[in-house]
Curated annotation (Swiss-Prot):
Pathway: Metabolic intermediate biosynthesis; chorismate biosynthesis; chorismate from D-erythrose 4-phosphate and phosphoenolpyruvate: step 4/7. Pfam families: SDH_C (PF18317), Shikimate_DH (PF01488), Shikimate_dh_N (PF08501). Homodimer. The keyword Zinc does not apply. The gene is aroE. Belongs to the shikimate dehydrogenase family. Shikimate binds at residues 15-17, 63, 88, 103, 219. The active site is at residue 67. This is Shikimate dehydrogenase (NADP(+)). One of its GO terms (molecular function) is shikimate 3-dehydrogenase (NADP+) activity. Keywords: Amino-acid biosynthesis, Aromatic amino acid biosynthesis, NADP, Oxidoreductase.
Amino acid sequence: MTLSLKLIGYPIEHSMSPWIHNEFLKRSNLEGTYELFEISPEESFEDNVTTLKKSVLTGFNVTVPYKQKIMQFLDEVDDTANLMGAVNTVSIRDGKWIGYNTDGIGYLRSLYAAYPFLKGVTNKRVLILGAGGAARGIFHALVNEGYNNIKIANRTLSRAESIIGTNKQALAISLEEAAEELHQFDLVIQTSAVGMNEPRSIIILDRINEDTVVSDIVYQPLETHFLQLAKQRTPYIHHGHTMLLYQAQAAFEIWTGTNVNVSGMDMQIEQILKGR
């Protein structure tokens, strides 16, 4: 069987996903293609979905700005994606479109690959910076993993509170409080767009401990200003391009049932991004 896979979103011309998934196909000895299907805001999203429904597809990824919009066109949505309110992976089985979200599991896999000593140690104190879709996915993945000491800091507090919901073991705080309390956290995860293609950090990092693990899910630039500041305080740095790799791995598993070996791919992605 030849797999037919796509990525829908806008803009996506510089996406790493085709390279990643075509590498997965090679490593798994599977035949198939992974192609971009760009839908600009000026186009009818519904018409494009109709076109996709008429084509022979194995599945597709969904990225911004369509991770919520796609949900109304799906036949089923798995519990995790429903909880997150967003879908980034669609599998097509017997004509049914089934939605998933691999953001959270992708983040955890990438974190544990970088720092195996964190796996199973769920009493760590965690700070999530930002309250968008990625923060929601990562928060629920951490909660499902058993983490019970999580704070979410955001400029608009109500957005952080909406992610936490009724979870009694999590707390929404301001960015100012987060900067003051930084020394209390074992893991700090930057999920906002601040620092994407600009030398800015969402908060001052002067109070980070030397054994704190610091993540930034932004991968353009490869090393954000946030991570550059963190490196002055701690050696435990976790780059965003690795989350991209592992959320893709989880999507590929959904489509193919194959647990693809990603060994060395993080370094290859790093080299490609450095060349841009």
